[in-house]
């Protein structure tokens, strides 16, 4: 956050208005004018770094504020360089997690201080929700380049050198624009109105935001990653931040058509996750997350496999799929299929023991079909027959009287009362 005048900290005290008319929002750049500080702000990004450009007024004191949202932080300033880390997170990480930063300002830093809330102080100790203020010796145009890493400060510096060091804001912006033009240009549409084109390409843009690249290049340029699944640094790729319960039937099917190489790399990353944590993630955020039902990464793998996207460890991926289909996960539901033992025994997930029972039954049946598809492809015919058979368990939710899929109790009875117009009643819907 750029700031001019007296130092103000705390979200409400330091906030500035900006006008839509003064704002440019593109996939590759954000620009606006901060009226309170009479400062033009622009930011562009690379895969692991960002470059901010501030155009300050010449008069008055001016500074850059950097503040993590939550968690303990530590910062150190030396010359025009800043390094540090924050442990802030919203879950899905092991103990010791940190996001490391390395940054440089292309202007002299006349002083620095730490702050928390509205209190300013000096020191280097790790503290909760601590930010850093960099006082700048001159106004005019200033560039602030920031690199991130989940491995270490040294790795953040390596990312800085590889992606933004010595490069102007304009060069980085143009590079980002070229990347986005290429990605969005992979699909050309004809006969659309301008509004339809804007809607289509805005939606296509959003399909490219997640999952996020989690791996980083080591000193030899080979991918490494900090694993949120076991807290260690490993060789290889990793992706993060995506739930599969809806994207398995939308985003990943699209990627299989317009970016099959990247899709294979994503699956290799989640196969690495299974090697490190023991299970495929149900929702990667960035590690295991108990959110939504089913193990739909199984469907992502099967869809890619049958379409020929197989540049990943297929045997290891299949082993993770097989574990999803046959073993009990944890009680929180962050991995494994909830109710899988009852599903195997009864042919459905009983509604008097598990929530979303009809949906779980159909999810498990569908992903059994996906397991069978891969099993058949790699020559595991006995497995294929087993899971093709279990895939028919979806029929056990169908009530011939009401013509709806419904939750069933362990004794075989359908849950009563039945109301097809109420979500999460005895009528369970599934798309």
List each language-model region with its residue ranges.
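Extended ligand-binding clefts on enzyme/binding-domain cores
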Residues: 290-295, 300-307, 359-362, 413-431
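A conserved hydrophobic secondary-structure block that centers on an alpha-helix together
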Residues: 37-40, 44-52, 57-63, 126, ...
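Beta-sandwich/jelly-roll carbohydrate-recognition scaffolds of carbohydrate-active enzymes
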Residues: 1-239
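Alpha-helical support elements that line or immediately flank enzyme active sites
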Residues: 53, 62-64, 202-217, 240-263, ...
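Catalytic cores of carbohydrate-active enzymes
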Residues: 372, 378-431
């Amino acid at each position: 956050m750029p700031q001019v005048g007296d130092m103000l900290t705390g979200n409400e005290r330091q906030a500035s208005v900006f006008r839509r008319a003064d704002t440019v929002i593109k996939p590759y750049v954000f620009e606006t004018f901060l009226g309170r500080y009479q400062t033009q702000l622009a930011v562009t990004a690379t895969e692991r770094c960002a470059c901010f450009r501030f155009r300050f007024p010449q008069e008055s004191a001016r500074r850059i504020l950097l503040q993590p949202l939550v968690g303990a932080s530590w910062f150190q300033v030396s010359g025009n360089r800043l390094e540090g880390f924050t442990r802030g997170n919203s879950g899905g990480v092991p103990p010791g997690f940190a996001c490391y930063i390395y940054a440089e300002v292309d202007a002299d830093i006349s002083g620095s201080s730490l702050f928390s809330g509205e209190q300013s102080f000096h020191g280097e100790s790790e503290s909760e929700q601590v930010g850093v203020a960099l006082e700048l010796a001159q106004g005019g145009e200033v560039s602030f380049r920031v690199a991130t890493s989940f491995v270490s400060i040294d790795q953040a510096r390596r990312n800085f050198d590889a992606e933004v060091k010595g490069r102007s804001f304009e060069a980085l912006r143009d590079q980002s624009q070229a990347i986005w033009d290429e990605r969005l240009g992979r699909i050309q549409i004809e006969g659309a109105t301008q509004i339809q084109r804007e809607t289509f390409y805005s939606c296509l843009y959003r399909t490219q935001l997640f999952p996020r690249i989690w791996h980083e290049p080591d000193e030899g340029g080979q991918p490494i990653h900090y694993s949120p699944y076991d807290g260690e640094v490993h060789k290889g790729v990793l992706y993060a931040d995506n739930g599969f319960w809806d994207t398995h039937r939308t985003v990943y099917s699209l990627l299989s058509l317009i970016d099959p190489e990247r899709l294979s790399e994503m699956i290799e990353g989640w196969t690495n996750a299974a090697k490190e944590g023991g299970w495929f993630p149900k929702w990667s955020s960035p590690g295991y997350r108990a959110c939504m039902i089913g193990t739909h990464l199984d469907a992502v793998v099967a869809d890619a496999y049958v379409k020929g996207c197989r540049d990943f460890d297929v045997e290891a991926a299949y082993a993770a799929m097989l574990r999803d289909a046959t073993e009990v996960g944890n009680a929180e539901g962050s991995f494994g299929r909830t109710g899988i033992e009852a599903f195997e025994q009864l042919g459905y997930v009983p509604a008097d023991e598990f929530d979303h029972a009809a949906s779980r039954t159909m999810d498990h049946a569908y992903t059994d079909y996906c397991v069978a598809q891969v099993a058949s492809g790699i020559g595991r015919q006995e497995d294929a027959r087993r899971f093709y058979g279990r895939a028919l368990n979806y029929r056990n939710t169908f009530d011939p009287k009401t013509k709806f899929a419904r939750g069933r109790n362990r004794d075989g009875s359908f849950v009563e009362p039945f109301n097809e117009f109420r979500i999460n009643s005895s009528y369970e819907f599934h798309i």
